[in-house]
């Protein structure tokens, strides 16, 4: 997943995810809007986006969807994450960006 970055917004009882493409070490190109969970199925929304963009390598697609599953499961098991928990999230998922609202 070195060509992509998943960004997660943590908002009370909602988690949102979007996908960015790395252009360089410092620049990102947004590819999707934020997909929200549990109001909608963020995983399914991301899968639909990936399926409609055949330039995304299948291996990257699997890694992206697996990472979303891991983060959502961690978030659900943790009940309510606080700003202090960002450090733990960054350690557990160093390839993602987390923003607590």
Curated annotation (Swiss-Prot):
This is Small ribosomal subunit protein cS23. Part of the 30S ribosomal subunit. GO terms for cellular component: chloroplast; ribonucleoprotein complex; ribosome. The keyword Plastid applies. Belongs to the chloroplast-specific ribosomal protein cS23 family. Keywords: Chloroplast, Plastid, Ribonucleoprotein, Ribosomal protein. HAMAP family: Ribosomal_plastid_cS23. It comes from the Eukaryota. One of its GO terms (molecular function) is structural constituent of ribosome. Pfam families: PSRP-3_Ycf65 (PF04839). Disulfide bonds: none annotated. The keyword Transferase does not apply. InterPro entries: PSRP-3/Ycf65_sf, Ribosomal_PSRP3/Ycf65. It is found in: Plastid, Chloroplast. GO terms for biological process: translation. Signal peptide: none annotated. It comes from Euglena mutabilis. Probably a ribosomal protein or a ribosome-associated protein.
């Amino acid at each position: 997943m070195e060509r992509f970055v998943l960004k997660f917004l943590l908002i009370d009882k909602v988690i949102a995810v979007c996908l960015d493409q790395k252009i360089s070490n410092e620049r990102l190109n947004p590819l999707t809007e934020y997909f929200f969970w549990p109001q909608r199925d963020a995983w399914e929304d991301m899968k639909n986006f990936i399926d409609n963009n055949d330039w995304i390598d299948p291996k990257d697609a699997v890694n992206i969807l697996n990472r979303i599953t891991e983060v959502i499961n961690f978030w659900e098991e943790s009940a309510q994450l606080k700003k202090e928990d960002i450090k733990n999230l960054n350690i557990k998922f160093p390839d993602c960006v987390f923003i607590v609202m």
